[in-house]
């Protein structure tokens, strides 16, 4: 009989743990979506290395020796 109670208790604990983990992963997903919406996509103009290009991209370009191209960087 104790075995059955222990089994039921283990199932309930596992179900509650899964619900908590699902809520945390959903929260992380919402944060990631907000970040992706605010980041600069590939080919988008940026001004400096610290600008928030999307993951895997960097703010590159802009030739300081060319007056026409100075400060025109893009997320690549």
UniProtKB/Swiss-Prot annotation:
Contains 3 disulfide bonds. Coiled coil: none annotated. Residues 1-22 form the signal peptide. GO terms for cellular component: extracellular region. It is found in: Secreted. Expressed by the venom gland. Keywords: Calcium channel impairing toxin, Disulfide bond, Ion channel impairing toxin, Neurotoxin, Secreted, Signal, Toxin, Voltage-gated calcium channel impairing toxin. GO terms for molecular function: calcium channel regulator activity; toxin activity. Inhibits voltage-gated calcium channel (Cav) currents. Belongs to the scoloptoxin-13 family. This is Omega-scoloptoxin(13)-Ssm2b.
